[in-house]
Amino acid sequence: AEHTPLAALDLTGRISTAGCSVNDATPALIKLPAAMLDHFGGVGKTTGDTPFALQLDCNSAVTISLRVDGAEPLTARGHGVLRNDATDDRAQGIGVQLLYHRQPVVLNHEMTLGSASAGRFTLPLTARYYQTRSRITAGQVSAVATYTLHYD
């Protein structure tokens, strides 16, 4: 008996690890509104709350942790404040505070955010100006933070 092939069957697949990717809707640059010096009233005062979100697309259920790294001013350590690194016409005594669910982000430290199922996971954040010294001057404010996501 002779056997003749009737059809060829190509099978392809992909094996991947569980994880998430940052959605294109996540902003890379956050612009705070202009603020007047009289909006501040002493060390620790804030203004210019600007909500934004890190949006993740997850391919399966995962536990997500976030680490935000950035330079903290000596006068505001432990308050989630990033140092003002503007190079031209820099405002003095002002930094940028990051909040997650209205609480200061602990910089340079990993925090567990919770579990995400497959699909979209949104991390609500806020950036705002934060007075770091009693004497402040007007000028530009620029801060940089690097975030790293870990998932299990």
Q: What are these model-derived regions, one by one?
A:
Residues 1-152:
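Mature extracellular/passenger domains of Gram-negative fimbrial/pilin and adhesin proteins
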